[in-house]
């Protein structure tokens, strides 16, 4: 079966060579194409006359300060250039008396869309796109669980995934690449600001850094919220493909979508990490520039700003960390003399084994009457009663020993019936126990 997902690299290379594709757009040509695209969107029939194109080129020519005398000739050259590069299609016949009709090609739409609409990357747009994807994948997974022949899978599973979900993933991926370009532009703006007035530059840099960081985190939170659910739905479809060798094309599409989704989500976190590093770099640069101001450039600017304060008021932000005092005397020698005297009873040492033996003997004596008289042992009540007699530091050891000794005596009949007991508080510090009443003793 021919691969329906993508062409191979050699096929694409030969296809490009046979059609002699080539792209070359100068700034004025690109502006002309964008003007055509925007004007075309306002047309109901999508058709453009040559006079329309010349009028649009006139606007471009005025912005680029080009000569009016050669306008018609340059407009014709620009139109022919866009037709040659397949950005425009020209239609003419003997009935139109030399008047041609133009339509923008898919290539022209794609290039213009990249520069115009793809810059509108926001959390709202991303949320809507992910919502559409979730609905499409949900319907596809429901259809996959119904089963059916290859035709059914192709129409109800493969088609929506390939022509809706995959295209939206590609759109999100392209938007993310636009965000990369936007970050580079912000870095260039910050570099320009740092060469200007210092106190204004620092404030503007902080604003740019904070806005970009906030946008990246907001977009990443949106992706993370939907990513796991989308992956789960794709796995749900993939599980329906087990044993269906005739549906390999669907399985390959699922794998491609999973890779695209992983790439989209990982991009967000990588972008945040890189931006955090850049944020720190900018702040370090500012601090270093101030600390290593050998020529006193910053000092001169500060003095000049103070002199001109009433003409150009400004705010000064200061921060001072509390000093850490070193109370140690550097000349103090280590005192190795032995301490003499008696320790308080609270500090006297008792080995852990001695303490445990004492507690065990006490608990055995306390629990023995329950077995002798056949009384049930409510561990919660016993623990609560006994722990009240000991300091908090020994509660853990006492509770463990009580439970060990009680379990040796017998078991709870409710345990064999799989009845889960409720949690009971056993001290005032939040400790709780979950245990059924022991009512069956060992013989």
UniProtKB/Swiss-Prot annotation:
CDD domains: MukF_C (cd16337), MukF_N (cd16335)
InterPro entries: Chromosome_partition_MukF, MukF_C, MukF_C_sf, MukF_M, MukF_M_sp, MukF_WHTH, WH-like_DNA-bd_sf, WH_DNA-bd_sf
A GO-annotated cellular component: cytoplasm
Presence of the UniProt keyword Nucleotide-binding in the record: no
Cited Pfam families: KicB, MukF_C, MukF_M
Compartments, record wording: Cytoplasm, Nucleoid
Chief site of localization: cytoplasm
Gene Ontology MF term list: calcium ion binding
GO aspect biological process, one term: DNA replication
Swiss-Prot/TrEMBL keywords: Calcium, Cell cycle, Cell division, Chromosome partition, Cytoplasm, DNA condensation
Reported function: Involved in chromosome condensation, segregation and cell cycle progression. May participate in facilitating chromosome segregation by condensation DNA from both sides of a centrally located replisome during cell division. Not required for mini-F plasmid partitioning. Probably acts via its interaction with MukB and MukE. Overexpression results in anucleate cells. It has a calcium binding activity.
Subunit comment: Interacts, and probably forms a ternary complex, with MukE and MukB via its C-terminal region. The complex formation is stimulated by calcium or magnesium. It is required for an interaction between MukE and MukB.
Protein family according to the UniProt entry: Belongs to the MukF family.
Record-given protein name: Chromosome partition protein MukF
Origin species: Actinobacillus pleuropneumoniae serotype 7 (strain AP76)
This protein's encoding gene: mukF
């Amino acid at each position: 079966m021919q691969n329906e997902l993508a062409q191979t690299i050699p096929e694409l290379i030969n296809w490009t060579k046979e059609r002699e594709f080539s792209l070359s757009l100068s700034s004025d040509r690109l502006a002309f194409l964008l003007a055509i695209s925007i004007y075309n969107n306002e047309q109901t029939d999508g058709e453009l006359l040559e006079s329309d194109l010349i009028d649009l080129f006139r606007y471009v020519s005025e912005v680029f300060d080009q000569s009016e005398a050669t306008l018609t000739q340059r407009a014709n050259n620009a139109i022919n250039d866009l037709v040659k590069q397949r950005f425009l299609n020209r239609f003419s016949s003997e009935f139109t008396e030399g008047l041609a009709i133009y339509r923008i090609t898919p290539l022209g739409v794609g290039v213009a869309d990249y520069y115009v609409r793809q810059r509108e990357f926001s959390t709202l747009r991303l949320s809507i796109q992910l919502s559409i994807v979730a609905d499409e994948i949900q319907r596809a997974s429901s259809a996959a669980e119904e089963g059916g022949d290859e035709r059914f899978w192709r129409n109800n599973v493969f088609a929506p995934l390939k022509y809706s979900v995959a295209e939206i993933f590609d759109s999100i991926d392209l938007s993310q690449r636009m965000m990369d370009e936007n970050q580079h532009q912000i870095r260039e703006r910050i570099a320009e600001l740092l060469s200007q007035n210092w106190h204004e530059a620092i404030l503007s840099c902080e604003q740019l850094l904070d806005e970009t960081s906030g946008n990246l985190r907001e977009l990443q939170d949106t992706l993370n919220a939907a990513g796991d659910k989308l992956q789960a739905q794709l796995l749900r479809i993939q599980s329906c493909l087990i044993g269906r060798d005739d549906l390999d094309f669907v399985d390959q599409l699922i794998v491609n979508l999973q890779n695209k989704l992983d790439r989209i989500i990982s991009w967000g976190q990588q972008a945040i990490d890189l931006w955090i590093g850049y944020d720190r770099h900018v702040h370090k640069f500012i601090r270093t520039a101030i600390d290593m101001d050998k020529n006193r450039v910053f000092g001169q600017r500060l003095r000049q700003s103070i002199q001109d304060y009433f003409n150009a008021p400004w705010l000064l932000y200061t921060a001072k960390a509390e000093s850490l005092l070193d109370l140690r005397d550097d000349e103090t020698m280590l005192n190795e003399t032995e301490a003499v005297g008696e320790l308080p009873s609270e500090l006297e040492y008792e080995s852990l084994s001695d303490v445990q033996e004492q507690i065990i003997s006490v608990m055995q004596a306390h629990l023995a009457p329950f077995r002798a008289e056949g009384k049930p042992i409510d561990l919660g009540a016993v623990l609560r009663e006994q722990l009240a007699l000991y300091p908090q530091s020994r509660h853990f050891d006492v509770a463990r020993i009580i439970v060990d000794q009680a379990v040796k005596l017998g078991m709870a009949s409710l345990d064999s019936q799989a009845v889960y007991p409720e949690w009971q508080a056993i001290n005032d510090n939040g400790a709780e126990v979950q245990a059924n009443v022991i009512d069956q003793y060992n013989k």
